[in-house]
Amino acid sequence: MTSRTAPASPVVHVIGAGLAGSEAAWQIARAGVRVVLHEMRPVRTTEAHKTDGLAELVCSNSFRSDDAANNAVGLLHAEMRRLGSLIMQAADANQVPAGGALAVDRDGFSAAVTKALAEHPLIEICREEIDGLPPQEWTNVVIATGPLTSAPLADAIRGLTDESALAFFDAIAPIVHRDSIDMSVAWFQSRYDKVGPGGTGADYLNCPMTREQYDAFVDALIEGEKVDFKDWEKDTPYFDGCLPIEVMAERGRETLRHGPMKPVGLTNPHNPTVKPYAIVQLRQDNKLGTLYNMVGFQTKLKHGAQLRVFRTIPGLENAEFARLGGLHRNTFLNSPKLLDESLRLRASPRLRFAGQMTGCEGYVESASIGLFAGLAAAADLVGQSLAPPPPTTALGALLGHITGGHIETIDAGPRSFQPMNINFGLFPPLANPPTKGPDGKRLRGPEKSVAKKQALSARALADIDAWIAAHLKLPKAA
């Protein structure tokens, strides 16, 4: 459908059907409000998308840790499940083994989201590009066009805000066909044999390197041909959570050994008495287990260089690649200046923003901001206002970062605002942090840190449940 004629009953328009837009549309419809979801693909595609499916995962297939007690992103998972998140439902239904992480079959995940939205009676999906500001008669709009917002819409937003959109680069990791990996060299094992959702403790493929192999690999990364930047891209920074592997290598020869190639928690069964100097890990990318992505191997190497360099990795000498790595430019808003606490544009409150373009980083973070934007948009339509969750929750802490928290002033220069993953550093401190363990002994070192995270998580889950009960009347998750 491509009609822009608004339905007779009140409606919210959501522009962009990625993770944030799909979640926003779902939450609006769950609240009993009609929604028109606009998606430009396949009418107009992007340099990173490969399909016309909704909520397509263009980078990793991992939603990261699912540990709600000890990890901030796992906590955000738990809060979103309590809030009836479609993205989390689809992720849980399409998970693949990934140690302690929640990873998904990307095609199955996108298909599940697409099906749920297409079948909802209050959701109309329009395949069209919104090539400027939404029409004035659209009085309640969620813009969730993501980091790959089309140029005409980005220019229109920039003109409305009189604010230059910020930008950074994201890099994409290669995907390898499982049957092309040499299993006389590689082996299955999760780090420290950790068992995660849908996993067995042997969920990653590991390729070992000697010191000599590692040194040669680092040299090849640094010397390999890279994609050239256009003049207007040269000052665009990388997001540190998605640095190309060759950029990490340039920062120091040992950087990779302390990052994605760290050799800890793993034992090579082919040579158990010799500790590898470095290890390359691959993670299952689809439910069939036929594809594996190279963990942490985002890259801007040219395709020929990728084939040459990555086939020097032991076990990948004959690797066949389903997808090579790539690089794309992301844009995001100066949200603390431009958006209010409900994610509305101060210059035009009928427009609300959601997802990665607000300055969050990560699949789950983007979807969670879409979730709140959808709830807030639905409340607006019936003349109500929805206060954000308390900052003690993962969702509230992330919203606080986006709409005003954690802004630094550097000397006399402008305030800086950068994309952020959810982390416990965004949470307010505990009033009474734990000092003693269950045995009564004083907590020290790592034990103290673990206890603090668990206390922050327990407080967050209690507070999100209280917020749901007070504002949303949703049933608690089991």
Curated annotation (Swiss-Prot):
Pfam families: GIDA. Its EC number is 2.1.1.74. It comes from the Bacteria. Residues 438-448 have a biased composition (Basic and acidic residues). FAD binds at residues 16-21. GO terms for molecular function: flavin adenine dinucleotide binding; tRNA (uracil(54)-C5)-methyltransferase activity, 5,10-methylenetetrahydrofolate-dependent. Its main location: cytoplasm. The keyword Transcription does not apply. Residues 429-448 are annotated as: Disordered. GO terms for biological process: tRNA methylation; tRNA wobble uridine modification. GO terms for cellular component: cytosol. Its cofactor is FAD. The keyword Endoplasmic reticulum does not apply. Coiled coil: none annotated. It is found in: Cytoplasm. Keywords: Cytoplasm, FAD, Flavoprotein, Methyltransferase, NAD, NADP, Transferase, tRNA processing. It catalyses: uridine(54) in tRNA + (6R)-5,10-methylene-5,6,7,8-tetrahydrofolate + NADH + H(+) = 5-methyluridine(54) in tRNA + (6S)-5,6,7,8-tetrahydrofolate + NAD(+); uridine(54) in tRNA + (6R)-5,10-methylene-5,6,7,8-tetrahydrofolate + NADPH + H(+) = 5-methyluridine(54) in tRNA + (6S)-5,6,7,8-tetrahydrofolate + NADP(+). PANTHER family: GLUCOSE INHIBITED DIVISION PROTEIN A (PTHR11806), METHYLENETETRAHYDROFOLATE--TRNA-(URACIL-5-)-METHYLTRANSFERASE TRMFO (PTHR11806:SF2). HAMAP family: TrmFO. Catalyzes the folate-dependent formation of 5-methyl-uridine at position 54 (M-5-U54) in all tRNAs. Belongs to the MnmG family. TrmFO subfamily. This is Methylenetetrahydrofolate--tRNA-(uracil-5-)-methyltransferase TrmFO. It comes from Rhodopseudomonas palustris (strain ATCC BAA-98 / CGA009). The gene is trmFO.
